[in-house]
Amino acid sequence: MQRRRTSKTPKQPLKVHHKNQTDLSAWQKGGRIDPEKSVQNHQSPNNQKNGSKQGSLEQALSYFEKVQDRVSLKKDSALQKHLTAVESIALQRGLPPEAFAVLLNVALSGKLADTVNTRLLKSLVPASVIPETSVVSSVSWLCVGKCSGNVQLLFLRWLITMFDFIDHKEQLYALYGFFFSFLQDEKMCPYVCHLLYLLTRKENVKPFRIRRLLDLQAKMGMQSHLQALLSLYKLFCPELVTITLPGKVKTYFKNSEGPWKAAINAVRQRNQQNSPVPQPLFLGTAQPQSRKRKWNTQLIIPVSSTNKNNLEEDKEKNHVDLYRMNESFPVEQLQTFSQLLQNIHRLEFPSQMGSVLINPLLLHYVNCIKDESIFLRLYYWMGQTLQEECTWCVADNNQYEEEFKDFLETVYKTECFLQEGFSSCEEFLYKTLPLWDGFCCRSQILRLVTWIPLSSFSEIKSHLYDPLAQLFFTSSLYFKCSVLESLKELLRNWLNWHVVILDSESGSQVHSLNTTLSGLVNTVAELIHFVGWISTVALRLENNPTFLLYFILDFYETVCDMYLRYNLPLLIMPPAGVFYPALLSMDSVSLNQLCYIMYRYRTNLVAAKENELSKRKILQFKFSTQTYREYNQYVIAMVGCLWTSSVFQKDVHPRGLCMDDELLKKTAVQEFKTSFNIVYHPAMMGYAVLFLQQAWPDDTTFNFSLIKGKKWNWYLEYLYAQGLKGLKVFIESSINRVSQASHNKAGNVEV
Amino acid sequence: KENADPQRTAFLLRKQWALYSVTPLYRFSNAHLRAYARLLSAFIAAEKQKGLAVEVGVELDIKVAVSSLPDLRGSEQDQAAILVQLSLRSSTSKKKSEEKLVWSGCFCCVFGDDLSEKIPQDFTCLPLFLTNGAESYTSIVGSWFQKTFDCSFRRLAISPLNLSWMAAMWTGCKVDKLTTATELVFSVSCLPQPLDISYAIHPEDAKALWDTVQKTPGEITQEEVDVFMDCLYSHFHRHFKIHLSATKLVKVSTAIASAHCDGIIKFLQSQYLTGVLMLLTELAISHIQ
């Protein structure tokens, strides 16, 4: 019975979306800053489960840190347990940076059996980054040769695959000579070549190294991996490498990705899904391999990278450009929020603006910069991508629904983050909603609807309401509730936006989009009337289910408070088709909700009236007397229904309950006159029974007429104690109880 | 504007071109075409040998030329068209004459004021992209442009409605010698075996019909196009008892040009090149917006 009333009143308008708002600390990538934190950052939000997982990983790490020589896997259950823990956590969400030192250390030290070492290495999947120090210390293990050849090979393959995940590489570059010396091992040679290929910089190319490579080639014959390294050397120092190398080689290196690539992608995807806003994609290499499709129709959000074009125009220009490059901060290096703050004045935007969608740091930047070209680039890209990938407009796209869903989800999260809708998204919705089946990507589409920008755009009816209404009436109860929910969010976003504009208007900002206040009020009113209409029809179609009524009343909880909470000079009463089903509901939840709403309407209307009187000037917007009249009619009906048992006589609403006594007699209901008040109302009768049982435990006749006078007051207290807070505020505000004897009257708002 | 040098745009004629729409190019500059060619050729080489280092500027197997075509535009507001050509150098001899053109692509805008008026300076409006050659090259060149100028490409399909407009417009055009038949291809796709119906009309007959339909010369309305097509349909129905209106128009070919609904065009008359490109530019712009 406990309703959400308590938390309701003090809520600030702008906090509505805090679910998707950002926690700045979450952008730090950890690793180099605070490993502990980054571990937590990469956890999924379902905390309970993770708490235990976190614990088991910590236990496993401390076990592996202390493990003594030669524990047998078969005999030692602790080893088994911890090994499985590491494996399962690694595959599910990847390992935190600090795990690598411990696990690499144990795997390469040769303390444990090879099967254990192999399994450990195979599960070394990073959640974010791999600390360079852990790699360096494992190279030193490699040099003392404690581990077997197979483990060495596996380690090298791991290193090649994970190369881009290592946070720094300076020390690793310094180990170039060590790696080079491993070339002599015939088995390791191909992998070492690949690693060297990744590590080689111009200063590494030395005559003695070239000689060594040529010797190896003479010994082993033309090997593609040696050729690759030689060709790179030749590229750096053509004067030192004089031999001719075959121009076309299909593949230089065997696939050394090993068992990790798939795991990395899976972990990446999962971590991205679980975070409130997409995690930064720190690497360009690990884009999920999308299916083979036409080149221009891949749904891939580009990775941030700086536009390097125009770099080498000519020699002179080159210098200038290089100088400029030193000045600007390449977007690839942007990893933490503090970096963003330090370099915000010299940050260059990525060459493909779409990449900001998956780069929260850049979204912060977008948020605070006013540059038309940024939005135009996003607009074009997003508009094209949405149209091209739309699964119900483009044939043959239905097999890619999951990807499209993910994309829409990303767009929605970005909109939440920016607290602003994209116009390309709006256009997409207008274009495609008429063709939508209401099923495909349902929740994503309905969420995007919530971010349609507020403008005095007159076509919103034919573009949004008409197609939505068609689907609404022909779809399930659940769909109806989802539509109402997203229209409520839409209304709230509009109202919040209006509040923000009002606030900033003092700083001489005018409504963007050239919306006047009256245009804006009209647009909001149109939405509320639309919801009133579809709600009325839906209640009839579905036969007044409480579930549906809840969503409808939830919408009106926002509507009834627009004047006070959002400073919008507009109040619209619910239509009779919503009001009466709620008033006569069999469920106390709906009745209580209605009471609360009517109480807030009263508060808002009274405040408006007072404002009007105190200002003594003609306000641009005045609530029409129609609104006051409608409110009064509803209140009279409510008081008659809940208090004075006079609803059939007093209700003056044209579509109300006023009925002739003769007609009422025909219903053969005894004492019809009293059949509606807080005791007899079907939604309240359950409380009355319980109250009677407590007040007169011996009386089993259920004599409701006993509840009167002082007992009536007790009964009220009893109802309030049951959590009917809405009823309480309504009765206390709208019912004049000073002179109980003379018929209780409705508090009248009209002054 | 018909004073463009027909020689310089002649390369477009009598070839099949695949059509794409392109969103405005960001920070594209006509002053850097040679640099673009160099970067693009390195990019192509890099794409071909997956992930291996490539030096920028050296002689590579594929030569890239990026040039400006000021003749190919409608008004002064239009950007000059950009032509991208890929030629294969034969590996045996290094002589220039051995180069073989393998792919060309042309970005253009003919009377695209609708779009170009609206966009800020940093953007270059060349909404129509035509390609001839292997799609693998289109893919590489397209990706490079996407990456470098933050634009998006979409295949420009031509709807049956637009095809019928083309049929009517092109039928009415004057051509010196009317040798090519006007041909319309319809597809009945809902059958177990797809069925294509080809409907060829003598160009003079078609023109005579169109002349009776068109009220004001130089101006075409949707209604006139509908009447023209309906006449053709009823004529066909009289002979074969098939309602063509129930099928889908997939291809139109006339002496002026031929167009396929998948977004393929072939220009046949240089004097009407600008006109056809203008129509295609319009389609491309509506595709973007």
Predicted features, each with a name:
Chain B
Residues 150-251:
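Terminal interaction module
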Residues 88-170:
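Internal, hydrophobic cores of structured domains that mediate oligomerization or house catalytic pockets
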Residues 225-289:
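C-terminal, charged interaction/regulatory segments at domain termini
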Residues 1-117, 264-289:
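N-terminal low-complexity/intrinsically disordered pre-sequences and tails
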Residues 17-30, 126, 149-151, 213-216:
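Charged, low-complexity surface segments at secondary-structure and domain boundaries
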Residues 58-62, 78-84, 103-104, 124-129, ...:
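Core residues of folded domains in eukaryotic genome-function proteins
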Residues 124, 130, 134-135, 199, ...:
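Amphipathic alpha-helical protein-protein interaction segments
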